[in-house]
A protein has these predicted regions:
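Extended, highly charged segments
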Residues: 1-507
Length: 507
């Protein structure tokens, strides 16, 4: 990440000085401990000055609406203490002057205010953008007494410069570091002849081109031109912040989804092991049948009885309850059979549901890893039940749509979108694609009365493979079938579907 330096700050300042001086501060907001939004108005134009003093991302800029959404700014219901202090002293005040401290990453905004006796008073808001030492300090310009700081600095953190209310504001110390010894040694022995040799040396030798700015054209190839320094700062740091926010949200959701996946896998293992154990269900029924067929035998109130097993053609010894008659023992075995059969059926049903849940969670994990925007992760967060769903009409998911040779193709990026594709978009003749045996997006090819060529079908298969968890270089099976052969079982998770009459292509 590129950090803000003095030259960039000064360029931003020169670009916006005319708007800043004479403007009025209308509103102050503090989303977190280390970022602030100042709503400033001048000559009928309103802008939001965004200040970020996080050590890894310190910067300031006038923020666009689009980039405000990228930054995922949420204003707390109860403002922090420093925000309330700034509101008390600065809201409604006019910026009378603004300066960038020479060779420092410090912007000072001077506010013209009035005290309780209606006496004019100039307050300075020092915005210090200096890495881990970044801070915002409000102090009296005349007395240099600090009124408040975004975060206080005590003597245990800095012996030179304490920052807290009531103390004098001291500017940051000037760095006394000069050139390193290595650089000094390199420059010390330079003669005029050597300097001329370096100046005349060819450092770039491209092929002949008409563009006289060839060097810069090639260096800037692939970059995006910006209209202003402010736009550059706003767009760059908003994209960085969005990426940081997305990665942080991904980490949280992955931890939750992996935890659920682990629990589900453990449950599947336990039930599978239980079902694989020796099953006595049929044995209980056989014992009941044998005892019923031999009720004439005098074996009441005995510990066991030896009878002929007509299924396996051999004599067997059947354990009995000596407190019961032979008939009562037969009924006891039938009850054991019924209970065992019911338990087995319930276990198999539970195992089936757990396997569906397992497939669903694997799709969730894929969706989290594939997500690149916060709104996509918000869908997953809602899907996992981590946020309250409001009682209002649900908005249609923003499913990605592309075109292949005139055909519309829809791609689901999460289970909510996948479910919408299957439940709402897919018609009987449309063609649905998905990777076999691995998580991935649902891909839907809309037919609209025109049958697609083999080339179009193969392109859709390639898309289904691309948007899946299949990372190995070897070929992967992609299945496709008509919409009329899809079925969503009742009470099944989002995005879960069964299918038939499918075809498979290796991609």
């Amino acid at each position: 990440m590129i950090n803000l330096d003095f030259l960039t700050l000064r360029a931003f300042f020169k670009e916006n000085i005319d708007f800043l001086i004479g403007s009025r501060l209308q509103k102050i907001q503090q989303p977190t401990r280390r970022d602030f939004v100042l709503a400033i108005r001048n000559c009928g134009e309103s802008r939001k000055l965004y200040i970020n003093i996080y050590p890894q991302m310190y910067h300031l800029c006038f923020m666009s609406k689009e980039n405000e959404e990228k930054r995922n700014i949420t204003i707390p219901q109860k403002p922090p203490m420093f925000c309330m202090l700034l509101r008390k002293y600065l809201e409604g005040a006019r910026i009378s002057d603004a300066i960038v401290v020479e060779n420092e990453r410090i912007l000072e905004l001077h506010f013209e205010t009035y005290d309780e006796l209606s006496q004019k008073r100039v307050l300075c808001l020092a915005i210090e953008l200096m890495g881990k030492h970044s801070n915002i300090i409000l102090y009296d310009k005349e007395t240099s007494v600090i009124i408040g700081c975004a975060h206080n600095v005590g003597s245990e953190k800095s012996r030179y410069r304490e920052l807290q209310g009531g103390l004098k504001y001291i500017a940051p110390p000037i760095s006394e570091r000069g050139l390193s010894n290595e650089l000094k040694n390199q420059f010390k022995n330079l003669t005029q002849e050597k300097i001329n040799e370096y100046l005349n040396k060819e450092i770039y030798n491209p092929a002949i081109k008409d563009d006289k700015y060839t060097l810069f054209a090639e260096l800037l190839d692939g970059s995006t031109p910006q209209k202003s320094v402010n736009e550059m700062l706003d767009n760059y740091y908003a994209s960085v912040q969005e990426r940081v926010n997305v990665n942080a949200e991904k980490s949280k959701l992955l931890e939750i989804a992996n935890s659920r996946l682990k629990k589900t896998k453990n449950a599947v293992s336990k039930i599978s092991a239980l079902l694989k154990k020796r099953d006595n269900t049929e044995k209980y029924k056989l014992y009941g049948d044998i005892l019923t067929a031999n009720l004439y035998v005098k074996a009441d109130y005995q510990k066991n009885v030896e009878l002929f097993d007509y299924v396996n053609n051999q004599n067997i010894i059947i354990e009995l309850d000596e407190t019961k008659t032979l008939n009562e023992n037969a009924q006891r075995y039938y009850r054991l059979y019924t209970k065992s059969k019911t338990t087995k059926e319930k276990s198999e049903e539970m195992l089936s549901n757990l396997n569906i849940e397992l497939e669903y969670l694997e799709n969730v994990l894929y969706s989290i890893n594939a997500s690149k925007k916060l709104d996509e992760l918000a869908d997953i967060k809602s899907e996992l039940g981590l946020v309250e769903t409001k009682n209002k009409k649900q908005e249609k998911p923003a499913v990605e749509k592309i075109q292949i040779q005139g055909f519309d193709v829809y791609i689901g990026k999460n289970n909510k979108q996948n479910d919408y594709i299957v439940s709402k978009l897919a018609k009987d003749d449309d063609i649905w694609f998905h990777t076999r045996l691995c998580a991935g997006s649902h891909v839907l090819l809309k037919i609209n009365g025109v049958e697609p060529s083999e080339e179009v079908l193969f392109e859709c298969c390639k898309i289904a493979r691309k948007y899946s968890s299949a990372t190995q270089p070897s070929k992967v099976g992609v299945i496709y079938t008509r919409g009329k052969y899809l079925r969503k079982p009742p009470a099944s998770p989002l995005g879960y579907v069964t299918y038939k009459n499918e075809k498979e292509v290796l991609v």
